[in-house]
């Protein structure tokens, strides 16, 4: 009795809520064996054919590749892709891929050479002798991903399961209408599928292995039972046909009675699920040493004349496959990648086949019927009754339409498997799945932005904390440096303290002077003398910096004196010109102007003499010569004036007075220059010296007296001229 109860419990299955029973339409394609399709001329291999990031390119344009050669490197969760045939890489550029929006992905474009040569294949026939890690790494590097539609990397999934997997489920339900790829694969390759299942079981070491298959596949069921006849480690469970029993959560509940928690994974309850096609790809990767370069694709629909299942190379354009199946497009023909409920319409037919492509549906207009106009929701709750995830599609519809993301998240929109059952039963023809897909995409974008903001905030806070730590450490170092002086400063500080202590000691000691003795002030006197000497030296430096160079050139001094004389002469001439311009000029004004001219000339003469006196060593002979020359010039001017007066019977007395004043000014200027030159000489030559021209040089005092006499004579001559003229 106990054994009977255990057997009953072992074969027990559960039923999930909701679900629908649409027309299956599988008989169009499941009746013919798998066939090969002729190679296309060009293959387009998108770098990303799975969930996760794309791999790193390892080929370049112009490279010749063989079938199975890696085109990218897979690291971490990145899955590599492999060349579907031998040929030449002609381009690496973005190309439209299998996506509802026909997004462009970076792709490797290969022109086939028609030889279809493989790389060297190294199969592991004795895979049981390899470790679990080695098998997982081989599966990952050979590009195996979930072929049931999700495209999750199989190696990553196996690695994440770890040792907590108790039940391995092989999904052979294939519940969506029209699709028969897994059905035909089990019929034609049942033994290889089972071998792949055993490899997965060897890696995971589960307590039980279950194959779930719907009862609408009798040929596949019979083939599997024949292969599993002598096997007791794998159980085949036949379940009722119901859509979507092939969903991961739904099939898990049907076979085990366990429900995957909201937001969780099946591995959380000890269950891991793989697809039939994935098991077949694992077998070819491990035992045959062949990377995944092709998969089974269903070509069906009334628009194709030869429906069936084919081995389609990855990267083959959809148009090439449909043409091989006898595609006869109508005016408004559509092609759906996937099934009628979960698939999407292709915008054009040059989209390549990828790892998740399981069906290409080309229906006629009669198959799909006339498009129905979307109407308002009547809240009939039919969608809620049909939902296999126990959600409220009508509420999610309102939240999605109203952009109420928080409420949609609170109502578990993430648990929606997008099976399309709600849209199938909706009497208002509302495309609920499209609303839900868009809402989930918007929520994902918001979450990604929040993650980026959180990461940026974390980086900023970490930077601020680091700066605070560095600042605190810097202040601490400064404090330690201030409290603890350096070793080289300790000696200086000690010496200073010793000097201060010595001074304090000396200040406290009394000064004792014995009777009859004088205090010893020699140190004080020496310090005073040193300060005086320092002050004198400083004053001498200041004076030396202020005065002109000690050794000036005498020629420059003479030039400056000549310039001063020229300026005085010019001013006198201007005065004479101004005086002659006026017919009636006051003699007093003329005398005043002459006096002003004499003052200016005297000032310029003094400046010139000052510049000349800067010379330390001036030859006194030259000074005497210059004085004699000045006297001669004055005498000559007086004679010229007398001659001019005698020639002119009528001479203006004013002009004569001006000329006399000019002569006196010149004589005085020359006298001052001679006196300045003579006074600057420290050592004067003997008074009676002979100049270069042979004239006798006179003492400067005598020269001054002679100049005065000359002035008196000139004045007397001028007065006499005035009297004679009157």
UniProtKB/Swiss-Prot annotation:
Q: Tell me the classification of the organism that encodes this protein.
A: Bacteria, Pseudomonadati, Pseudomonadota, Gammaproteobacteria, Enterobacterales
Name the residues that bind [4Fe-4S] cluster 2.
Answer: 387, 416, 419, 422
Q: Where is this region: Disordered?
A: 537-559, 568-587, 593-699
Q: What does the entry list as the binding residues for [4Fe-4S] cluster 1?
A: 377, 380, 383, 426
Q: How is the cofactor bound?
A: Binds 2 [4Fe-4S] clusters per subunit.
- Enzyme superclass (EC): translocase
Query: Quick one: where is this thing mainly located?
Result: membrane
Q: Where would I find the 4Fe-4S ferredoxin-type domain in this sequence?
A: 369-397, 407-436
Note the subunit structure: The complex is composed of six subunits: RsxA, RsxB, RsxC, RsxD, RsxE and RsxG.
EC numbers: 7.-.-.-
Biased composition regions of type Polar residues, renumbered to the chain: 677-692
Q: What is the native source organism of this protein?
A: Escherichia fergusonii (strain ATCC 35469 / DSM 13698 / CCUG 18766 / IAM 14443 / JCM 21226 / LMG 7866 / NBRC 102419 / NCTC 12128 / CDC 0568-73)
Q: Which UniProt keywords apply?
A: 4Fe-4S, Cell inner membrane, Cell membrane, Electron transport, Iron, Iron-sulfur, Membrane, Metal-binding, Repeat, Translocase, Transport
One GO CC annotation, please? plasma membrane
Task: List, in alphabetical order, the Gene Ontology terms for molecular function in this entry.
Answer: 4 iron, 4 sulfur cluster binding; electron transfer activity; metal ion binding
Regarding the membrane, this protein is recorded as: Peripheral membrane protein
What does the UniProt record say this protein does?
Answer: Part of a membrane-bound complex that couples electron transfer with translocation of ions across the membrane. Required to maintain the reduced state of SoxR.
Q: Which InterPro entries match?
A: 4Fe4S_Fe-S-bd, 4Fe4S_Fe_S_CS, Ion_transpt_RnfC/RsxC, Nuo51_FMN-bd, Nuo51_FMN-bd_sf, RnfC_N, Soluble_ligand-bd
> Which regions are flagged for Low complexity bias?
658-676
Which family, according to the similarity comment?
A: Belongs to the 4Fe4S bacterial-type ferredoxin family. RnfC subfamily.
Query: NCBIfam families recorded for this chain?
Result: PRK05035.1 (NF003454), rnfC (TIGR01945)
What is the protein name given in its UniProt record?
Answer: Ion-translocating oxidoreductase complex subunit C
Q: Which SUPFAM superfamilies match?
A: alpha-helical ferredoxin, Nqo1 FMN-binding domain-like
What is its subcellular localisation?
Cell inner membrane
Q: Which cofactor does it need?
A: [4Fe-4S] cluster
Any GO BP: electron transport chain
């Amino acid at each position: 009795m106990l054994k009977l109860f255990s057997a009953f419990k072992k074969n027990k299955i559960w039923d999930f809520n909701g679900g629908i029973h649409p027309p299956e339409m599988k008989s169009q394609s499941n009746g013919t064996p798998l066939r090969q399709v002729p190679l296309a001329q060009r293959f387009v291999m998108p770098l990303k054919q799975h969930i996760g990031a794309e791999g790193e390119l390892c080929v370049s344009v112009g490279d010749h590749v063989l079938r199975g050669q890696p085109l990218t490197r897979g690291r971490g969760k990145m899955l590599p892709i492999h060349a579907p045939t031998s040929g030449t890489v002609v381009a690496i550029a973005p190309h439209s891929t299998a996506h509802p929006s026909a997004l462009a992905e970076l792709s490797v474009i290969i022109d086939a050479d028609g030889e279809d040569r493989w790389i060297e294949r190294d199969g592991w026939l004795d895979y049981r002798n390899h470790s679990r890690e080695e098998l997982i790494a081989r599966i990952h590097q050979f590009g195996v991903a979930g072929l049931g539609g999700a495209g999750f990397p199989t190696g990553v999934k196996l690695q994440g399961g770890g040792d907590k997997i108790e039940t391995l489920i092989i999904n052979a339900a294939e519940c969506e209408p029209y699709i028969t790829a897994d059905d035909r694969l089990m019929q034609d390759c049942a033994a290889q599928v089972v071998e792949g299942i055993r490899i997965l079981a060897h890696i995971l070491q589960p307590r039980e292995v279950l194959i779930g298959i719907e009862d609408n596949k009798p040929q596949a069921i019979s083939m599997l039972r024949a292969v599993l006849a002598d096997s007791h480690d794998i159980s085949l469970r036949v379940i009722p046909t119901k859509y979507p029993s092939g969903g991961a959560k739904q099939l898990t509940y049907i076979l085990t009675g366990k429900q995957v928690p909201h937001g969780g994974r099946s591995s959380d309850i000890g269950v891991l699920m793989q697809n039939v096609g994935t098991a077949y790809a694992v077998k070819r990767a491990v035992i045959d040493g062949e990377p995944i370069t092709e998969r089974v694709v269903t070509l069906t629909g009334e628009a194709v004349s030869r429906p069936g299942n084919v081995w389609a190379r990855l990267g083959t354009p959809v148009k090439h496959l449909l043409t091989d199946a006898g595609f006869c497009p109508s005016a408004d023909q559509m092609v759906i990648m996937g099934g009628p409920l979960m698939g999407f319409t292709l915008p054009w037919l040059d989209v390549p086949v990828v790892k998740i492509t399981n069906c290409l549906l080309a229906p006629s207009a009669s198959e799909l019927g006339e498009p129905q106009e979307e109407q308002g929701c009547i809240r009939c709750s039919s969608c809620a009754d049909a939902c296999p995830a126990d959600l409220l599609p009508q509420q999610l519809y309102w939240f999605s339409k109203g952009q109420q993301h928080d409420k949609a998240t609170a109502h578990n929109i993430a648990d929606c498997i997008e099976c399309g059952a709600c849209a199938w039963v909706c009497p208002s023809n509302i495309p609920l799945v499209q609303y839900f897909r868009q809402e989930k995409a918007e929520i994902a974008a918001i979450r990604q932005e929040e993650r980026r903001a959180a990461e940026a905030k974390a980086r900023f806070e970490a930077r601020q904390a680091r700066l605070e730590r560095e600042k605190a450490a810097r202040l601490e170092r400064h404090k330690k440096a201030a409290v603890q002086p350096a070793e080289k400063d300790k000696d200086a500080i000690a010496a200073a303290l010793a000097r201060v202590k010595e001074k304090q000691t000396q200040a406290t000691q009394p000064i004792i002077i014995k009777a009859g003795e004088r205090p010893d002030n020699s140190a004080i006197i020496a310090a005073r003398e040193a300060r005086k000497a320092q002050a004198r030296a400083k004053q001498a430096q200041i004076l030396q910096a202020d005065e002109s160079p000690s050794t000036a050139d005498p020629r420059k001094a003479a030039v400056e004196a000549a310039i001063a004389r020229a300026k005085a002469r010019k001013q006198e001439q201007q005065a004479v010109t101004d005086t002659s311009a006026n017919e009636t000029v006051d003699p007093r004004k003329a005398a005043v102007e002459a006096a002003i001219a004499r003052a200016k000339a005297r000032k310029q003469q003094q400046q010139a003499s000052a510049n000349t006196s800067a010379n330390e060593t001036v030859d006194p002979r030259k000074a005497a010569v210059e004085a004699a020359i000045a006297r001669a010039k004055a005498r000559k001017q007086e004679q010229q004036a007398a001659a001019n007066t005698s020639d002119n019977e009528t001479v203006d007395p004013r002009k004569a007075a001006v000329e006399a004043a000019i002569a006196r000014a010149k004589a005085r200027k020359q006298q001052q220059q001679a006196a300045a030159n003579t006074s600057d000489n420290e050592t004067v030559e003997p008074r009676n010296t002979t100049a270069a021209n042979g004239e006798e040089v006179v003492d400067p005092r005598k020269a001054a007296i002679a100049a005065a006499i000359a002035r008196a004579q000139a004045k007397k001559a001028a007065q006499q001229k005035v009297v004679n003229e009157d």
